Amino acid sequence: LDAAEKMKQEGVTHVVLLPLFPQYGIETTGRAIAHWEALIKNHEIAARPTTAIWEFASNDKYVEALNERIDQGLQRFPRKARPDVTILFAAHGTFVGDSKDNKDPYCCLVHHTVDRLMQKRNHDHAFKLSFVRDGGWGTSISIDLKNQFSDLARAGKRAVLVVPVDYVTEQFDTAYMLDVKARTEAEASGIAYYHVAAGLNCHPLFIEGLTDLVVESIVPSSKKPEMLCVEACPRTGWHGKDEPEGDKCSVCPFLSNPKENKTARPSQRHGSLSTASTRDPVSRKS
């Protein structure tokens, strides 16, 4: 409401909504945009011509910024350990259940980000993807993440670089979870070298990517939003809850015909313990 009041004072006539969640999720981007719509519907803020940026999971500059953070993170390991570092991508686990029940595209989009990153790196390191929360926004570490550390140690992988893949800033709770609690679990499992890549924060390429997205959203285009995964189309008829914040977004971009979109290979694969030099990335399995 404070932002809306400031917009009124400054004479803003058009709005671009840019939720800072790279991967669309019903309970993140969807909830944020639905809340904005509810404020307008309830006449709490003025209606203005509005466009929204739904996701940027595979945006080139976002991916390149993440790639640079990986390079920087690898430099923190002893030189002799760098070739054997496993990249462990860390994503929220809170909404994965919704991906199954509501066909939320979140999980699939996370995989697309990881795939794009590892393709850019030519699969130069072994990698895994872990969802770090079993549910809720607390600081409890998921069983999945604990198991990942144990599996890596048993496989002789004792150097791990954790890369936050759907966190764009270093929030206190996230930093504490990954750099303190997860480190304790990793060391207890036998991981000898453990580092967490820096968040994107104000990385120049990331900011450029966001700028490009905003410009593209206000330039007239005949291009329709694309759905990255054939299973990602959320169900229709989301509205109906009493609380405005609980509404699902009414204009999700993932409602196109699935037959017209490319099929992704979502969720079955969470990485590879082999690098490109020893294994074809197309054939990797969980």
Regions found by a protein language model. Name each.
Residues 1-286:
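Extended amphipathic ligand-handling, pore-lining, and cofactor/metal-binding catalytic surfaces
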